[in-house]
């Protein structure tokens, strides 16, 4: 029999339900979590035994949105869901980051978390629901996991923090922050903000962590009622004698190697030391495992770097804790791009471009939460050559998608609205060298490239990555961390913003016990670093260029009567197609009558504007126009009078005498003066050649052939 166990609790303005025991009973654990009609089904499967020779923790997190959750059928030929979207990839990373550090050291059994969105309320984002579900499922599973975690979204509306704001509330919020953590400590922060202060950001993190305690309490209560027995897993016993022998051979040599400031030289020397140490030990005892020796050497490396930092000694590359690496900033480095910059910080370098397009270049995104159009695109590429390696080149990986999204958040707060700057903007960051914080280099490069392109950004923005080394109560916060310091440290803390405040904050903590004081120190130290970088950037370019690139399309905006839109478009789009071909421009028309003409040549744009004005001009009764015969019928002729307008000249209005045959007087393509007699309710125009020639005698009236006149 199915015996579901359910927990219900109020979480901010929403009701959350946790249910287990109903579905997927062959999985290690399964939970259905719902928050006001948004429901996510989360399963966990863990392997009881690790694969032989496994030397890393194979945790996989899959997040998938089913279109039936929103009452939709997928598009595409096959009408079913395909590869994960960018949004799904970002949420999978959001779930992964706070749970990964909570598995014990040495646990290498394969674990897979699958979160499936099965129902969605457009006002409640599934990401927080999925994070709660993953935490609950892992806690119920019995797998060694030092959770549970809670998760919360924090908004900032009318100077007040708001817990789990709805999608509608987020539109007026100056902050969108997701925080996850255990009962004791914050583990992850992901946010974008409208240039808030350090204190406001820290307050949001603390608020979110306090509010999510109710989630942790309810998961713990559910585990007491329905949790599986904890696995009897023990880490492998530490071979103290072997550790001591490896340390004796390698520790002092590794300590010397980590005084080499050049990354490639240091890596080469470290590789030599490791290879020689392993070779020596295996020669002494053939039963030793090279992978195990590699892990011991890695632990020694970590200890060497950390102990030096904690002792106040210079860092790996010789810097003090709050020193930024040398900066080189250049703009306009690529001649034909609309905007470009090369930003170099030590051994990290980003070549960033900005491209301007029209509204039709914007990305149409069809999500479960509804359709939207994105007119600011940010793409981050991390080729293998940036770290001196070979590798696959192809579609972006999870890391590239995540870093691109973070960099975009860093710049978003200073971007103009589509009304202020009616262009689609695409920024691409090519990481050409990498040794720490390429995403923050992308923020700096993007700010420079946008200014170089003439995009009216509100301010320059810069980003910096901070690190942390902590042992007991002793801690050191590091500015502008290297790749090694990120890997061997306890925290990765990225902050982007302008001189006025923070635009993006991302934090990943690998240990418990990060206090509010440590976060405060890190934020303040990051501010000093950010202002230093902005000072250097401003020497290269301190304001957006006054004009956009000569190679960028110039968008001219005019307004027409919405009733005239159909005239500009024409039947089946015939008029607008002809206009774009004739003028060499791109023309977009909005429902309110706003017309945007994009052209790289100003004369072409003016030509298009004149033609549109002709088409939309009101026909004046009694006015004389120059027309061209477009069609001849038995009862008269149709004459085009410019602007796509056409009227009928009845046979009785061709000449001041009786006309038997229209073709005796008019030919196709013939230019004639016409007077507007009437425009009826349906917009049909009556014209007269006879009255036009009477009014303007200089205009020759059409005559019958000479033979006819002589009769």
Curated annotation (Swiss-Prot):
Major enzyme class: transferase
Localization (cell): Cytoplasm
Reactions the enzyme catalyzes: RNA(n+1) + phosphate = RNA(n) + a ribonucleoside 5'-diphosphate
Record-linked SMART domains: KH, S1
UniProt keyword list: Cytoplasm, Magnesium, Metal-binding, Nucleotidyltransferase, RNA-binding, Transferase
Chain positions covered by the region annotation Disordered: 689-711
Quaternary structure, from the entry: Component of the RNA degradosome, which is a multiprotein complex involved in RNA processing and mRNA degradation.
Protein name stated in the entry: Polyribonucleotide nucleotidyltransferase
Organism placement in taxonomy: Bacteria, Pseudomonadati, Pseudomonadota, Gammaproteobacteria, Enterobacterales
């Amino acid at each position: 029999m199915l015996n579901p166990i359910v927990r219900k609790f109020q979480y901010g303005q929403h009701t959350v339900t946790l249910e287990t025991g109903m579905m997927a009973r062959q999985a290690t654990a399964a939970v259905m979590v719902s928050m006001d009609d948004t429901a996510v089904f989360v399963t966990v499967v863990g392997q009881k035994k690790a694969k032989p020779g496994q030397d890393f923790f194979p945790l996989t997190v899959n997040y998938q949105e089913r279109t039936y959750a929103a009452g939709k059928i997928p598009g595409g030929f096959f009408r079913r869901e395909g590869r994960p979207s960018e949004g799904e990839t970002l949420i999978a990373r959001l779930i992964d980051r706070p749970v990964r550090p909570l598995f014990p050291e040495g646990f290498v059994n394969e674990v897979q978390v699958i979160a499936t969105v099965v129902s969605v309320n457009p006002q409640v984002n599934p990401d927080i629901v999925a994070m709660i579900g993953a935490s609950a499922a892992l806690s119920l599973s019995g797998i060694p996991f030092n959770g549970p975690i809670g998760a919360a979204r924090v908004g900032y509306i009318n100077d007040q923090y708001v817990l789990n704001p709805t999608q509608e509330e987020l539109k007026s919020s100056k902050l969108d922050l997701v925080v996850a953590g255990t009962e004791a400590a914050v583990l992850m922060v992901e946010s974008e903000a409208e240039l808030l202060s350090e204190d406001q950001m820290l307050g949001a993190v603390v608020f979110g962590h306090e509010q999510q305690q109710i989630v942790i309490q309810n998961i713990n209560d559910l585990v007491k009622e329905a949790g599986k027995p904890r696995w009897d897993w023990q880490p492998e016993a530490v071979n103290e004698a072997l550790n001591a022998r490896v340390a004796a051979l390698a520790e002092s040599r590794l300590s010397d190697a980590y005084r080499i400031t050049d990354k490639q030289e240091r890596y080469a020397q470290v590789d030599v030391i490791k290879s020689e140490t392993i070779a020596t030990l295996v020669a002494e005892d053939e039963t030793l495992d090279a992978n195990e020796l590699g892990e011991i050497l890695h632990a020694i490396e970590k200890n060497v770097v950390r102990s030096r930092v904690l002792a106040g000694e210079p860092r790996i590359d010789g810097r003090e804790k709050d020193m930024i690496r040398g900066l080189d900033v250049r703009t306009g480095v690529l001649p034909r791009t609309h905007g470009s910059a090369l930003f170099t910080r030590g051994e990290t370098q980003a070549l960033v471009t900005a491209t301007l397009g029209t509204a039709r270049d914007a990305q149409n995104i069809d999500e479960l939460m509804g359709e939207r159009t994105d007119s600011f695109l940010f793409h981050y590429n991390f080729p293998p050559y940036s770290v001196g390696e070979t590798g696959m080149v192809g579609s972006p990986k999870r890391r590239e998608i995540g870093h691109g999204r973070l960099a975009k958040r860093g710049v978003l707060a200073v971007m103009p609205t589509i009304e202020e700057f009616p262009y689609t903007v695409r920024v691409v960051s090519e990481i050409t060298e990498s040794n720490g914080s390429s995403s923050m280099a992308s923020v700096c490069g993007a700010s420079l490239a946008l200014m170089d392109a003439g995009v009216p950004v509100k301010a320059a923005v810069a980003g910096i990555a901070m690190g942390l080394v902590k042992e007991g109560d002793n801690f050191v916060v590091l500015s502008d961390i290297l790749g090694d310091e990120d890997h061997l440290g306890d925290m990765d803390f990225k902050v982007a913003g302008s001189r006025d405040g923070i635009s993006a904050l991302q934090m990943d903590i690998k240990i418990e016990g990060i206090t509010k004081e440590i976060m405060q120190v890190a934020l303040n130290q990051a501010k000093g670093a950010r202002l230093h970088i902005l000072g250097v950037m401003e020497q290269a370019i301190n304001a957006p260029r006054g004009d956009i690139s000569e190679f960028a399309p110039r968008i001219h905006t005019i307004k027409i009567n919405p009733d005239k839109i159909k005239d500009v478009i024409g039947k089946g789009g015939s008029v607008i197609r002809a206009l774009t071909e004739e003028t060499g421009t791109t023309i977009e028309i909005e429902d309110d009558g706003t017309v945007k003409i994009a052209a790289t040549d100003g004369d072409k744009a003016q030509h298009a504007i004149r033609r549109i004005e002709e088409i939309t001009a009101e026909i004046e009764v009694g006015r004389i126009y120059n027309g061209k015969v477009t069609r001849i019928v038995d009862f008269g002729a149709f004459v085009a009078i410019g602007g796509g307008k056409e009227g009928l000249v009845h046979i009785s209005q061709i000449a001041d005498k009786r006309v038997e045959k229209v073709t005796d007087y008019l030919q196709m393509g013939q230019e004639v003066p016409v007077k507007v007699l009437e425009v009826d309710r349906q917009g049909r125009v009556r014209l007269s050649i006879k009255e036009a020639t009477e009014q303007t005698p200089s205009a020759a009236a059409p005559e019958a052939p000479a033979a006819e006149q002589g009769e």
